[in-house]
Design a protein with these regions (language model features):
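Short alpha-beta junction capping motif
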Residues: 25, 77-116
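Alpha-helical scaffolding within the catalytic cores
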Residues: 60-67, 84, 89-95, 159-163
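An acidic, glycine-rich "communication" segment
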Residues: 23-24, 29-33, 41-42, 115-191, ...
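Surface-exposed patches in mature extracellular/periplasmic domains of secreted proteins
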Residues: 56-65, 108-111, 129-137
Length: 217
C-alpha cells in the first residue's frame, strides 16, 4: 500500500469519528479564473436527493477544498465545475494525481465553456491517460437508476449530445467528465433555471448514480 492510499484510508474514518454522518463530499477550488463556485445550490440538493431516495448518510453540508491541499484526501468524492479557465500547477497536478490513485473520485461537470481548459489540465494530472467516451452500458449509467442512452441532456448549448468521458487508471474509473449535459444546472434550486420537474429529477438521478458508483467502486 503506498503512503497516499494509507493517508486516504486513515483520514476518512477520522473525519467520520466526529460526525454522525458516514462521509462528507467537497467542491474543488482551483486557480485560473474559472468560476469553481458556480451552481452554489446544486450539490446540497443532490445530497438531499441521495439521502431521501438512496438512504445515503452524507453530511448535508459540503466542503470546499483546494486542489493542492492535503485535506483533499478526506473526501471520497470531489465535484468540480465551472465555465472557463482552469490552471493546475505542477504541485497541484501531483496532489490530485495521488488523491485519485489512492482511491478518490473526481466528477467534472462542464457548465459550458470548460472543455478547452480542463482537458489539457487533466493531462498534467495523468499524462499517460486520455479521456475515453464511456459506452452506454457502463455501470455508472446503471446504478439505482438506468440511463439506457447515457447522460441526460439538461441544457442545450451547441446542438451536441451529452457525453460522458472517463479517465481509467489501472482498470478503475477515477474521473468522470460530464460534457454538454449541464447536470449541475439541473441540481440547482428550481427557481434558478426554471427547469421542468422531469428535467430536474433526471439530473438528480444521474448525479445520484455518479455518487453511488464512486462510493462502491
Amino acid at each position: 500500500m503506498n503512503k497516499y492510499r494509507f493517508i486516504f484510508l486513515l483520514l476518512i474514518p477520522l473525519t467520520m469519528a466526529f460526525s454522525s454522518y458516514s462521509c462528507k463530499i467537497a467542491v474543488l477550488k482551483y486557480n485560473g479564473g474559472g468560476d469553481w463556485y458556480a451552481n452554489p445550490t446544486s450539490l446540497n440538493n443532490l445530497i438531499q436527493f441521495c439521502q431521501a431516495n438512496l438512504n445515503m448518510n452524507i453530511n448535508p453540508i459540503y466542503d470546499v477544498v483546494d486542489v493542492e491541499s492535503s485535506e483533499l484526501f478526506r473526501y471520497p468524492f470531489i465535484h468540480m465545475t465551472g465555465h472557463g479557465n482552469v490552471v493546475f500547477s505542477i504541485s497541484e497536478s501531483e496532489n490530485l494525481r495521488q488523491y485519485l490513485k489512492a482511491g478518490g473520485f473526481l466528477h467534472i461537470d462542464d457548465n459550458y465553456g470548460m472543455d478547452a481548459f480542463i482537458r489539457p489540465e487533466m493531462k498534467k494530472v495523468f499524462p499517460e491517460l486520455d479521456f475515453i467516451e464511456l459506452p452506454f452500458t457502463h455501470p455508472i449509467y446503471h446504478q439505482s437508476y438506468n440511463f439506457e442512452n447515457g447522460l441526460p441532456k439538461i441544457h442545450e448549448h451547441d446542438n451536441q449530445p451529452a457525453r460522458g468521458y472517463g479517465l481509467i487508471y489501472e482498470g478503475r474509473l477515477v474521473c468522470f467528465y460530464s460534457y454538454e449535459s449541464d447536470l449541475g444546472d439541473g441540481w440547482e434550486d428550481p427557481n434558478v433555471h426554471k427547469d421542468s420537474q422531469n428535467i430536474r429529477i433526471s439530473a438528480l438521478k444521474m448525479g445520484a448514480n455518479i455518487i453511488q458508483y464512486a462510493f462502491t467502486n
